[in-house]
Design a protein with these regions (language model features):
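Juxtamembrane/transmembrane-helix boundary motifs in multi-pass membrane proteins
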Residues: 4-12, 37, 41, 97-98, ...
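Extracytoplasmic/periplasmic sensor domains and loops in membrane signaling proteins
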Residues: 93-98, 102, 127-159, 222-256
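Solvent-exposed, extracytoplasmic
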Residues: 97-110, 177-180, 184-226
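Extracytoplasmic/periplasmic ligand-binding sensor regions of membrane-associated signaling proteins
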Residues: 109-112, 118-191, 196
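Short, hydrophobic beta-strand elements of compact beta-sandwich sensory domains
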Residues: 168, 172, 180-191, 258-287
Length: 287
């Protein structure tokens, strides 16, 4: 005789099917939840990358205009004649001054130029910008602008203590055949060329936007740049999109990092041809 405490076979089958259905539903729900989180995370990181590209493109446009201005100053025959010839008369001096003046005022960067000069690094200088009324340029003061060589750097004006930070670009002026060093051309731009394009940038709670240049890092916040310890220097990034030759497309990177016990996703977009990048941190717990 069968035990009265044992479920009939049919009841066992029903309960088994119910239990299986519950387990299946839980598994499907968990899988959908994971897939949903992955989808949201992927979309959020892609959106951050897209937004960084927009800001980076605007900054690149300004820096390309700066390069164009410096290139013009270094090869313009009227300016180079004034810089390089031993004997220059008044007419040549005025012609060089007016040529640079016209280029300065017509530049798309005009409102951002703090200091712009071309010099033979001795006794001839053509200078424009809002800081040109500071200490005079001469053989000694010129050297203070070029202590780190040519290129792009984040600095302050050496002749005006307490002046705001600026992005400085410089390059040499050479002879017509490009062999002899004739002088230097220097351009200092206010940091609004970075902060203006980033104005209104959408950040979620806990996110942060940064400007990285060389090994240094600045947070972009409330229209200003604040230097901070670069704890992202050793981040192991994964390449997302590589810059294409001849096409304005910045190289994009992604990674994950732990800072102060909290996990973050990192999206980085490097500017074409420059040791600079825009970086966004996104808290991992928001996905």
């Amino acid at each position: 005789m069968k035990s009265s405490h044992r479920f009939p076979l049919r009841r066992q089958i029903v309960w088994g099917m119910r239990f299986f259905t519950i387990l299946t539903s839980l598994a499907v729900g968990a899988a959908l939840f994971i897939l949903s989180n992955q989808y949201v995370r992927a979309n959020s990181l892609q959106a951050a990358e897209f937004n960084l590209r927009l800001v980076a493109t605007s900054i690149e446009t300004s820096l390309d205009s700066a390069d164009a201005l410096l290139n013009w100053a270094s090869i313009n025959s009227t300016v180079r004649r004034y810089i390089s010839q031993e004997d220059v008369n008044g007419t040549q001096t005025i012609a060089a001054y007016e040529a640079v003046q016209e280029k300065y005022y017509s530049s798309t960067l005009y409102s951002h130029i703090l200091r712009f000069f071309i010099t033979n690094e001795n006794d001839r200088h053509l200078q424009f910008g809002t800081l040109n009324s500071s200490a005079a340029l001469n053989r000694t003061t010129i050297k203070q602008f070029l202590t780190k060589g040519y290129g792009m750097q984040f600095t302050t004006d050496p002749l005006l203590p307490g002046s705001p930070d600026c992005i400085a670009l410089s390059q040499p002026v050479r002879s017509g055949k490009g062999t002899l060093h004739r002088g230097s051309t220097y351009l200092a731009l206010d940091t609004a060329i970075i902060t203006d394009p980033a104005a209104g940038y959408s950040l979620t709670d806990g996110s942060a936007l940064y400007w990285e240049m060389g090994s240094r890092l600045w947070q972009i916040q409330n229209g200003s740049l604040t230097e901070t310890e670069n704890r992202l220097r050793e981040v192991d990034y994964t390449l997302r999109t590589e810059s294409k030759s001849g096409v304005t497309e910045q190289t994009a990177w992604q990674s994950k990092v732990q800072l102060d016990g909290q996990n973050y996703y990192v999206v980085k977009v490097t500017l074409n041809g420059r040791s600079a990048a825009l970086v966004q941190l996104l808290p991992a717990n928001t996905f």
